A protein has these predicted regions:
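Conserved ATP-binding/catalytic motifs of P-loop helicase motor domains
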Residues: 1-219
Length: 219
């Protein structure tokens, strides 16, 4: 699968693999946010990491914000079922119920990489709870317990859903507003892998629409 990566994807692959291959080098970024519009190959990247690392005998934990999204991942599951986080609690009281001697705690200790797919639908409180439980399980105070973590998603597409929540509440609750998000090194994919000849102009227009930078039309 690595041979199929384009130039931008290969750059992302190498940046994420660096701290995995050099676990004692704390100067390397260990937390990443992978941004890219729909069709840029984010899902392909996640499964490439999974296949490569599992082929090396390493453990990878791959989770998503919804069960439908999780089906696109290699051995995927939802983040709330894996990390025992109640997604309906949207306050600072959100916690993980993982026990230190449980099977998932053992997997976390062994994991070379943790991937959270469609993290744009994850609450800031869930991210905070994840950061805390990783530190607790790994028994250190380094960001995310020194684990290599990749969050990914496109804020142009899917945001979290809050029952009866209005726009202000949704914006306040996204992971970008979590203090623990500052540890993430930004990675970007730009090339649309789904476009065919003659469709790039429309793909560019969709990105402009998603960025909110289309010219305003006065009626």
């Amino acid at each position: 699968m690595v041979a199929q990566l384009n130039t931008g994807q290969r750059k992302v692959f190498d940046q994420v693999m660096a701290p995995i291959n050099q676990p004692t080098n704390l100067t390397l970024p260990r937390q990443f946010y992978l941004d890219g519009p729909g069709g840029s190959g984010k899902t392909f990247m996640y499964n490439t990491f999974g296949n490569v690392l599992e082929g090396q005998g390493k453990t990878v934990i791959m989770v998503a914000s919804t069960r439908i999204a999780a089906t696109l991942l290699l051995n995927g599951a939802t983040y709330h079922s894996t990390f025992k986080i109640d997604p309906s609690i949207i306050t600072d009281t959100t916690t993980s119920k993982i026990e230190e001697h449980s099977h998932i705690a053992k997997l976390i200790r062994e994991a070379s990489l943790i991937i959270c797919y469609e993290a744009t639908m994850m609450t800031r409180y869930a991210l905070k709870a994840l950061a805390k439980i990783l530190r607790k399980i790994m028994k250190n105070n380094l960001p995310y317990g020194k684990k290599v973590v990749v969050l990914g998603g496109d804020f142009r597409q899917c945001l979290l859903v809050i029952k009866h929540g209005k726009r202000v509440k949704m914006v306040e609750t996204i992971i970008k507003n979590c203090p623990f998000s500052s540890h993430f090194h930004q990675l970007k994919l730009h090339q649309n892998m789904r476009t065919v000849a003659g469709s790039q102009k429309h793909a560019d227009w969709l990105i402009t629409l998603g960025n909110g930078t289309l010219p305003r039309l006065e009626i």
